[in-house]
């Protein structure tokens, strides 16, 4: 079983072409729904009394929600952001932490023996605390963001030291080490403790650092881009979901996991919020994977 810990949010996303208000979002939502295409997935997080019943049902249909706390006294985490014309830059308009500000995470007894744990972008101290609740996972992967790097860098470093792998984007990696070279960043990530590091570069693909080697992978070519919000979390969910089905962790399985991460990220950006991810099936993923291999085979 895979357990995903992170935020479940109501997102307001503004692009030059469309605005969607208070739609289902959050790091754990995207990551868990993406991962559920590969492995039985459970989710740990908190929502407020204003969380729509329809979103609760949507999550319930895709993942195990016994680890989801519903507060009767507070509101759901709300994130309001705007994208630039080319959708490459996002500006935060408003962040309302609400119920997550004082959230003390717990997990159901059934989750304790989870073999796979994904710590989605969240407060690094909360991530480390929830990690203590699991018995002995086979694989732990984490994510982070610029906010935590700028304000809690030491805790981010400690968190990275406790996991098997880390996924973050190019700007975050450069910020973490105050280093302009992405390859140097990847090597430095590996030196902290994890067995592998993945740096996502958006439309320029991804870079894997494993066993002292670099493995770059181009992005899946996508012409329809509506909302990039959940791309990274969808990548992470698919990445660990795919690895959970493999017999061993090696360069081959990691490279294939990166392909599946890019594929699920490419699906996520084709519609607003979570809409695309909940409307694809195994055949859609398989067809895109085969096309991906065909494009990049010489």
Question: Across the structure, where does each feature detected by a protein language model lie?
Answer:
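Conserved beta-alpha-beta core of the PfkB/ribokinase-like small-molecule kinase fold
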Residues: 116-187, 205
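Active-site metal-binding loops of divalent metal-dependent hydrolases
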Residues: 6-8, 234
């Amino acid at each position: 079983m895979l357990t995903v810990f992170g935020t479940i949010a109501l997102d307001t996303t503004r692009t030059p072409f469309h605005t969607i208000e208070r739609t289902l979002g959050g790091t754990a939502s995207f990551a868990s729904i993406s991962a559920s295409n590969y492995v039985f997935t459970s989710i740990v997080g908190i929502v407020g009394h204003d969380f729509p019943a329809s979103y609760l049902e949507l999550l319930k249909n895709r993942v195990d929600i016994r680890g989801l706390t519903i507060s009767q006294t507070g509101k759901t985490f709300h994130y309001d952001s705007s994208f630039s014309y080319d959708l490459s830059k996002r500006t935060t308009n408003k962040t309302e932490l609400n119920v997550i500000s004082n959230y003390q995470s717990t997990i159901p007894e059934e989750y304790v023996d989870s073999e796979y744990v994904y710590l989605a972008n969240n407060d690094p101290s909360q991530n480390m605390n929830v990690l203590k609740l699991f018995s002995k996972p086979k694989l732990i992967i984490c994510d982070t963001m610029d906010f935590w790097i700028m304000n809690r860098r030491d805790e981010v470093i400690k968190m990275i030291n406790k996991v098997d792998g880390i996924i973050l984007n190019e700007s975050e990696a450069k910020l973490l080490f105050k280093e302009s070279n992405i390859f140097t960043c990847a090597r430095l990530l590996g030196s902290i403790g994890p067995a592998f590091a993945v740096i996502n570069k958006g439309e320029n693909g991804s870079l894997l650092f494993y066993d002292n080697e670099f493995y770059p992978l181009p992005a899946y070519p996508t012409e329809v881009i509506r909302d990039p919000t959940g791309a990274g979390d969808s990548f992470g969910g698919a990445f660990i979901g795919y690895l959970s089905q493999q017999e061993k962790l090696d360069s081959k399985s990691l490279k294939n996991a990166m392909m599946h991460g890019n594929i699920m990220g490419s699906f996520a950006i084709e519609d607003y919020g979570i809409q695309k991810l909940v409307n694809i099936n195994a055949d859609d993923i398989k067809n895109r994977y085969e096309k991906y291999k065909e494009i990049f085979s010489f």
